[in-house]
């Protein structure tokens, strides 16, 4: 099976890349490929779409760090069950209105379901053994401007690329996972309080476990 490991930056995947270079895979076994998609939705969307057209993967795993709305999540690794475009809309005097509330998009038009980009591969999510949380994708976060999160579930994970993964893989019908290690609270710009190193170590550890499990996994795991 062709496995595509997607990350926004080298930093998030470097340790796993080194491990892969020193790991021996069987001739007919897992065939992993790394792709650095770049920061943000546009770069990620282009890189992922282009790679799928060049060589369709059996599974895409997007791996990276993220922020969380709950302090207890810091240092943990989770799988993302659904994504929302948290700041795509208009800030009115009365508050933020997303594209669905504005009537610009149907909240149930595929690949959206009630305004969310769900990962339908529930068996795959369960197989990870990780807590499954909701994700929100943003273009900008300011410590004093968290209105977008007030409209979402209490326990959410923030990134700048997650929705691009979900949207493209849903449209292309490619199985996918989004794995996030929580390094900080959303809106906290004081990096002295971030647990970046710990998050990266935890992310690498879970990715290695996941790849080793995939080497012996039945491909029926990738069915909806």
Where are these regions (language model features)?
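Metabolite-binding pocket within alpha/beta catalytic cores that recognizes anionic/polar moieties
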Residues: 1-109
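Hydrophobic/aromatic beta-strand patches that form the interior of the parallel beta-sheet core
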Residues: 35, 61, 78, 131-136, ...
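Short loop/turn motifs at secondary-structure junctions
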Residues: 56, 73, 131, 173-175
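Mid-sequence, gly/pro-rich, charge-dense loop/helix-turn segments that line enzyme active sites
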Residues: 69-157
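Generic non-transmembrane alpha-helical segments
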Residues: 120-130, 168, 206-213
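A C-terminal functional module that forms or caps the active site or interfaces directly
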Residues: 137-187, 191
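Regulatory input/activation interfaces that engage signals or partners
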Residues: 182-224
């Amino acid at each position: 099976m062709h496995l595509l490991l997607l990350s926004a930056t080298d930093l998030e995947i470097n340790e796993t890349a080194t491990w892969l270079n020193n790991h021996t895979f069987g001739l007919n076994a897992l065939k992993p490929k790394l792709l650095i998609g770049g920061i943000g939705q546009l770069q990620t969307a282009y890189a992922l779409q282009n790679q799928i057209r060049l060589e369709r993967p059996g599974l895409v795993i997007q791996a990276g760090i993220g922020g969380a709305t709950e302090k207890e999540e810091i240092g943990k690794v989770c799988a993302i069950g659904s994504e929302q475009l948290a700041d795509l809309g208009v800030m009115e005097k009365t508050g933020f209105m997303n594209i669905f509330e504005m009537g610009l998009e149907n909240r149930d038009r595929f690949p959206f379901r009630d305004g969310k980009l769900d990962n339908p591969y529930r068996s795959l999510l369960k197989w990870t053994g990780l807590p499954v949380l909701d994700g929100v994708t943003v273009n900008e976060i300011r410590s004093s401007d968290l209105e977008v999160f007030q409209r979402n579930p209490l326990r959410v994970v923030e990134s700048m690329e997650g929705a691009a993964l979900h949207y493209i893989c849903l449209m292309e019908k490619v199985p996918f996972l989004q794995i996030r290690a929580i390094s900080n609270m959303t809106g906290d710009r004081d990096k002295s309080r971030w647990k970046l190193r710990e998050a990266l170590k935890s992310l690498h550890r879970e990715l290695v476990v996941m790849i080793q499990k995939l080497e012996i996994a039945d491909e029926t795991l990738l069915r909806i």
